[in-house]
């Protein structure tokens, strides 16, 4: 096993070690004091803010309003919906004592908010005139992970969860697909991740849902990462929490509810989709700094170079480019170059006395064969926005090519087992949860989704030879 000069393990040697080292050394996260928890450092949190700002605006366009609900939920709320409590029980963190006394009823620390929001909906909805009701919450949640992995599966994480209540089933189903489209666009346009969207099989559904939809992304090791989900909950939670309304005909009816969520694991997806042996590679749309200027302040022109770097930064920021000047005097330019490569900054500008005399700066792209070239200082504010757009497109195209190259249509069991070791398999599936358990036991692969855009296909199950439960092939992969 080898490391590069930054002390980062090569991906091909140990992808898991590479990931753990990069998220820490690039300044995204640190480990929290309690096992399985994490601290999101400012650099990582800024990525989350950029995703959050875009997603929040799109969710509001869908008609959702932000609200906040309690983190502590009475335990009996979870017992009202049998499938929900069964699905979440192993992950629940429960408070039994407070104020030096045992509580009369244990309180669950929020793993998700369908229960408490359902209780509030029952108070707020009385008439068909109150519908649809659309709510959104930005919060932390706690799920007691036995095998935590930073940003992907931690005991506590940040997320967005949307909830809605509707008169018609068709409207609720449409809401789940609208939310899925929002997530798809966010992943593609902001994170440069070419996801596949589709419906989960019965065995992979959210606890208490009738339909669960997902966006799945392929990581650089060929594994899948479920990056966001949306759920049609039918009237399950409406019945459990008595969410009724009076119809126009003065009859009582239950609402149809939905929920959908995206978390900080999207940051982990960005790391594993785009990163390389040098460290992070950040899409410009989510990069805290799109450009870092490194002034080379040696000799008698140090002050002049420093002022020129600051002036260039101001003009770039005025052009809408997030820019940082690394003027730390205690570090050499070479050290700074390596650090900002590790931290994934899309473009680095090197500016020294000779560059200043020539009226140019050396532009270094984080990726590409011809990564280094001079650019006129005067032209930088007009040229760099377009160069950043090209960088964003290149990352998306590169990730799309990698996904397509590692997705294989398979029709026999031997080929299936070989394929899921390094990528995704498109296979016929019977839809039986017991068959899915057998597949997982033998290959560690699970059904990721029935793709929305998949071509029609029929046949016999890849594992048990039973008839297909779907009119398409199913994506199987090992997953995080």
From Swiss-Prot:
Localisation: Cytoplasm
Gene Ontology CC entries for this record: aminoacyl-tRNA synthetase multienzyme complex; cytoplasm
Reactions listed under catalytic activity: tRNA(Pro) + L-proline + ATP = L-prolyl-tRNA(Pro) + AMP + diphosphate
Domain of life: Bacteria
GO MF annotation terms: ATP binding; proline-tRNA ligase activity
Keyword list, A-Z: Aminoacyl-tRNA synthetase, ATP-binding, Cytoplasm, Ligase, Nucleotide-binding, Protein biosynthesis
Keyword Acetylation: no
Protein EC: 6.1.1.15
Pfam families for the chain: HGTP_anticodon, ProRS-C_1, tRNA-synt_2b
Main EC class the enzyme belongs to: ligase
Single biological process term from Gene Ontology: prolyl-tRNA aminoacylation
General function of this protein: Catalyzes the attachment of proline to tRNA(Pro) in a two-step reaction: proline is first activated by ATP to form Pro-AMP and then transferred to the acceptor end of tRNA(Pro).
Subunit structure comment from the entry: Homodimer.
Domain remark from Swiss-Prot or TrEMBL: Consists of three domains: the N-terminal catalytic domain, the anticodon-binding domain and the C-terminal extension.
Family to which the UniProt record says this protein belongs: Belongs to the class-II aminoacyl-tRNA synthetase family. ProS type 3 subfamily.
Protein name: Proline--tRNA ligase
